[in-house]
Amino acid sequence: MKFNSGALFEKLRGGAGEGNTLNIALYVGLAIFIVLALANFLLSATTANKAQENITRASEMRVISQQIAKNALEAAAGNADAFELLDKSQKGFQSAWNAVKDEQVSDPEAMARLQTLWDEVNANADVILKGEDTVLDLHEVADTLAQTIPSLQAEYEGVVEILVTTDAAPEQIAFAQRQSWLAERIVRSIAKVLEGGDGAVIAADSFGRDASLFGRIMNGMIEGDAAMGIDQVNDPDALDYLAEIADLFDEFVNQSVDEILETAPELFQVRNAADTIFRRSQDLLEESTNLNNQFENTTSGLFPSVWLGGVSAGLAVLFFFIIMAQRNRQAAKLKDELESENQRNQAAILRLLDELGDLADGDLTVQATVTEDFTGAIADSINYSIDQLRNLVQTINNSAVQVASAAQETQSTAMHLAEASEHQAQEIAGASAAVNEMAVSIDQVSANAAESAAVAERAVAIANKGAEVVQATIHGMDTIREQIQETSKRIKRLGESSQEIGDIVSLINDIADQTNILALNAAIQASMAGEAGRGFAVVADEVQRLAERSAAATKQIETLVKTIQTDTNEAVISMEATTAEVVKGARLAQDAGVALEEIESVSKTLADLIQNISNAARQQAASAGHISNTMNVIQEITSQTSAGTTATARSIGNLAEMAQDMRNSVAGFRLPEHS
């Protein structure tokens, strides 16, 4: 059979051209899918990392929003450390907000609302930080006054004791007692000023007026003040007490009045700013939570991209096997055509096969010899195919290495994200436990406050009963005073009656003297009459003896009357002194009633304050419970994120194994060292 080398050569060229076109298309598709897979995996990893950072920032904003509210209230209450914590929290929130405010979210209006809320909270935080020196100085002054006022009260108690002991005027005793009440009112007014609220302005005005009145009364007791009706204290010991009181008042109280009144408006601004932050912190927490949820929803769109990358990698592997199958089909077709063409080509083919024997073992370093016979075209085509196969194997090796490297990096990143998510879940669990403990503590505070409120209410009832007892005592002392006055009047009338008896006794004494004189004259006349006047002399002697006995009796009566008058005068003086003491006791009892009314008022105020503390503690406990539930939800979401990241890492690990399998599939081919 004659061999047509020209026809065979043209057929081979046509078949090779068609195969090259198909191979190029397959190579292009393989390269496209490999690049697409790598780009998709890198983009997914970058996007996931950015989304996780946004979620972390939003979570930080949620926590810091509550820290700002807590630190603002503590700073306004005079806690020096709270100002530093507030400044740190403010900067932390601003930093987190700057990092996420330009991110794209599904609800842009939420970002605008959050910006508005933060601007308001940030401005009020600046007000608090600006007033740090004023608040701390004012609380320091208040603490100094709180330590000084008890000393003033103790000194005035000494003054009152001395005045009572020395029987001073009741008005002086009342003024001295009033000073202790004024000192107590000054302390309460300062406390109300520091607490802020609606009554703070009134408390500041009351503080100024009470401090001024305290100073005027103090100076009046030392020097006297006719306008206020205060007499100067003369007792040296009492004056020593008053001098010490004046030194304390001038050193601590008087110098602090103007400072407190001048800085009180700025303190009110700080308190209002803290209250505003506390009210808006819940809205800030809700908007931060909304932002966190939007960022978490954004991460859910990453997983289709990951699967798209896996599909692209699978298609790349499929294209590789299609190329190999195409090559095998071309080789088989060429072999069939050669065998069917002519058996005479067997020798040339065997020679060519001998040269290419190592190619069957995967040795791509062989090179077929191109001769002038018909095997030359075959050798040339085989050499071309070997070159293409070399390029293909080299491309597969390089692509597999790149895919494996990218998969390892992506897997490392995913595992790092999984570890970070697990660590975040642990931290959230710890925070949730701490919040639960805080809720238990707040419940205990609420229970203690409720019990204190009950005790304060009992104190109010006791003070009320004490006031009633004092009123009854005053009424009884008034009755005693009236009875003593009535008795004094009767004793005075008895003295006047005894005076009249004395006058009558004097008259009787005069009559007795005159009778005695008449009897003496009668006796003289009887003796002059001689025997005829003897009987008349006996009568005259008897009359004289009766007159002498009457005179002696009248002297005894006169002595008794004088004794009665003396006792009556002493009784009148004693009754008047008793009446004065009763009046003084009534005034002291009335002052005690006023003091009990003050105690009742203070106890009511204390009960209201304790009730407010209890209500606030219950509200804080409810907020802490809500935070704990929220933290549990965050922990569950973080656990799900960690599980998803771990699953992604396993999928990427499978991709790396597929790349290794692809390298193993071409490991049997031997390439030239220079390539």
From Swiss-Prot:
Membrane topology: Multi-pass membrane protein
Cited InterPro entries: Chemotax_Me-accpt_rcpt, HAMP_dom, MCPsignal_dom, NarX-like_N
GO CC field: membrane
Pfam family, one: MCPsignal
Family: Belongs to the methyl-accepting chemotaxis (MCP) protein family.
Signal sequence, renumbered to the chain: none
Domain (Methyl-accepting transducer): residue spans on this chain: 399-635
PROSITE patterns associated with the record: CHEMOTAXIS_TRANSDUC_2 (PS50111), HAMP (PS50885)
Subcellular compartments: Membrane
Keywords from the named record: Membrane, Transducer, Transmembrane, Transmembrane helix
UniProt protein name: Putative methyl-accepting chemotaxis AlkN
TM helices/strands, residue ranges: 24-44, 303-323
Taxonomic source organism: Alcanivorax borkumensis (strain ATCC 700651 / DSM 11573 / NCIMB 13689 / SK2)
Task performed by this protein: Chemotactic-signal transducers respond to changes in the concentration of attractants and repellents in the environment, transduce a signal from the outside to the inside of the cell, and facilitate sensory adaptation through the variation of the level of methylation.
Location of the HAMP domain: 343-394
CDD domains cross-referenced by the UniProt entry: MCP_signal
